[in-house]
Each structure stands twice: as structure tokens, then as C-alpha cells.
Amino acid sequence: MSPKAAARVTSERQKVLALDTNIFIYHFEENPAYAAFTEELFDKIESGRVRAVTSALTLHEILTGARKAGNPELASLYRNLLGSFPNLHFVAFDVTVADISSDLRARYGLRTPDAIQVATAIHQRAEAFVTNDEGLRRVKEIKVTVPPAAG
């Protein structure tokens, strides 16, 4: 098999995970209950063993948190880090995600941000949506994975 063909097969088999905002926050804050999980997850993403997608809403929520805390330098650091993180793709809110998210919101009574995040995962054909929100397990259109807490 040629190197080009091998690369194509490898990329076709690459696992795609969608990440909720809380996974990033736990990682940045080094939350002891989830530090081992997020460290391993982001190592896999950075090395290319896993490809990650998340809604642009994630960036909005992370930057808002830093700015509300009065820390524009931290917001800038997060923006630069996330914008250049390998194998992480931010997905814009578009009409397709709007359609899917409105259906999820109506069907499951999800809050709008949760519906947008899950709709983004579905639209991107992610294998799973990784979140710490147990309530999202009721969504049947995608596998919802909640990381185990240490301790």
C-alpha cells in the first residue's frame, strides 16, 4: 500500500468526538475529578489519534467566562490556544445546525446552548458527544458520553 493510500485509510478510520464546553473548562481549570480523563483526551486529539469538533459556542462560553472574571489576558490566551490546537475544529452555527437544534430543543426540552452543541455533534457525524451533563443522555440521536469522575 502506498503511503498516500495508507494515510487515507488511517484518516478514514479516525475517531471523531464532539466536545461540550464543560470538558474544556475542566481541562483548563485542572479539575481534579476529571484531570486524568481530559489530559488523556486532549493528548489523543493533539497527537491526531482522535479528531475533535465543537460548536463555536464553546469559544464564546470560554471567552465570556474569562472576560467576566476580569481577565482579558486569559481570554486572549484561550483564544490563541484553541485557535491553533491541532485536530480541533470549531463549527459555525448555520441553518442546518439551527434546524437540528430546534428539533432537539422541541423534542427533549433542551436549553438552547445544549441543543446547539448536540446538533453540532450530530451534523458533524461525531461518534459521540462528550459532556458532563448527565441529562443529555436522554438524546437518542447520538451517543452521549459522560466521563467518569476520579475519586
Can you describe what each PLM-predicted range is?
Residues 47-49, 84-85, 125, 139:
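Structured helix-beta-strand junction loops
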Residues 2-6, 12, 39, 88-134:
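Active-site neighborhoods of divalent-metal-dependent phosphate/nucleic-acid chemistry enzymes
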Residues 65, 74, 78-100, 106-107, ...:
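Short acidic, glycine/proline-enriched helix-loop-strand junctions
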Residues 24-25, 59, 98:
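A short, flexible beta-alpha/helix-coil linker loop
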Residues 1-54, 67-76, 80, 134, ...:
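Short, well-structured N-terminal submotif of metal-dependent ribonuclease cores
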Residues 28-30, 122, 141:
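Short, function-defining helix-loop hinge/capping sites that tune catalysis or transport
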